[in-house]
Amino acid sequence: IGVATQLAVLAATDIEHGPIECLFTVDEETGLTGAFALQEGFMDGDILINLDSEDEGELFIGCAGGANTTAEFTYQPIEAPQDYFFFSVAIKGLSGGHSGDDINKNRANANKLLNRFLSQLNAKYDFYLCKIDGGNLHNAIPREATALCAVPMKDKEPVRIDMNIYTAEIENEFSVTEPNLRTELSSESACATAIDRDTVDKLLKSVYAVHNGVYAWSQDMEGLVETSSNLASIKMVDGKIKIVTSQRSSILSSRKDMSEMIRSAFELGGATVTTGDGYPGWKPNPSSPILKVAIESYQRLFGVEPKVKAIHAGLECGLFLEKYPSLDMFSTGPTLRGVHSPDERMLIPTVDKFWRHLLDILIHVPVK
């Protein structure tokens, strides 16, 4: 919608505005690579209106910075007893959502729920873990996770009973935020190999120990998450188990501290851990001149004052500001819901208000 809006402005011949540039970036959702590649001197303007927000009537003036911390466990394949009961365990139907915007909503993390049950099985039975897979995008709360396991045939029914008990427990814990949560336990064909026992123990304990969710709330803006971490994905690739986590914070030192906590838990489990360079946050400027123009415009058009907020998610604005420190900017957009999930959608009536507001701002931006 941001791209379409810019193209509409460029194509129109009846829109009043001063000198204007439109900046298009690629891969915002997967790594901010377009914004990272922006060079100093590429743009001439000193006012930027970011069109990437998700709530009409709310103007954003700050965001969190973030970085990914990745752990890799190297395992040895061992022979799986062919006379054991092989079964898959799955966590499904979770709400998911954006790991910044939705991290404060107490939604379940499929990787954590699966690991919790596998840890119970590992402690109680002669347990083999053959495969594990959960989550996908680093910036999404995982909705599904699965594992292929094996226990002695005599423990087939006890495992099913344990699953029923565990399902009732987590359904009770997440009765409000995860109404569609479901678990599945299905018989499977035998798997030739499994992950060695030592790695399984260390993997399950490390994932159990790693923090997931809100860690600290902002002391400056009520209701704003300051620091968080998301256990985004668990994948088996080329003889290794790769776990991607994502840390966010509006305070750089707190984000680094959170990343070190994650690193410590995984390194204690014997994993190799790396933390990426990350991306910067955007410190709010309530005295922004363009923000004043936007607020007055909204009041003039709709008779109410827009909400001015900061967001616990990564916007490209932090990177723009790093390259252009004098930029005066805010972020806006129509209302979107279910972002970063299969349920992603846009509330169409909000597009008209968003469009009218943008055009009025363009009219009233002071021309130097």
Label each region the model flagged:
Residues 1-29, 87-91, 98, 105-121, ...:
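Alpha-helical metal-binding/catalytic segments enriched in His/Glu/Asp
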Residues 1-82, 130, 215-218, 222, ...:
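Acidic/histidine-rich catalytic neighborhood of metal-dependent amide-processing enzymes
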Residues 6, 62, 79-84, 103-133, ...:
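Acidic-enriched catalytic cores of C-N bond-cleaving enzymes acting on peptides and small amides
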Residues 40-41, 107-124, 152-156, 201-208, ...:
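His/Asp/Glu-rich mid-to-C-terminal helical/loop segments that flank catalytic regions of hydrolases
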Residues 102, 109-111, 116-132, 284-327:
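Active-site-adjacent substrate-binding region
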Residues 147-148, 182-193, 230-234, 242-252, ...:
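A short beta-alpha structural unit
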Residues 219, 226-239, 302-361:
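Zn-dependent metallopeptidase/amidohydrolase metal-coordination segment
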Residues 253-272, 281:
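Redox- and metal-dependent alpha/beta enzyme cores, enriched for Fe-S-associated oxidoreductases
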